[in-house]
């Protein structure tokens, strides 16, 4: 792999987008399996 590509992947906007996509997909899947839970008490 190119070092510039790895440096690009480690920048804040890319990490922020990946993290938001992961969080959104987790919430969507949890909402699919537990549709009546409006919040998740941890």
Curated annotation (Swiss-Prot):
GO terms for cellular component: chloroplast thylakoid membrane; photosystem I. It is found in: Plastid, Chloroplast thylakoid membrane. Keywords: Chloroplast, Membrane, Photosynthesis, Photosystem I, Plastid, Thylakoid, Transmembrane, Transmembrane helix. It is a single-pass membrane protein. Its main location: plastid. The chain crosses the membrane at residues 8-28. GO terms for biological process: photosynthesis. The keyword Chloroplast applies. The keyword RNA-binding does not apply. It comes from the Eukaryota. Belongs to the PsaJ family. May help in the organization of the PsaE and PsaF subunits. This is Photosystem I reaction center subunit IX. It comes from Rhodomonas salina (Cryptomonas salina). The lineage of its organism: Eukaryota, Cryptophyceae, Pyrenomonadales, Pyrenomonadaceae, Rhodomonas.
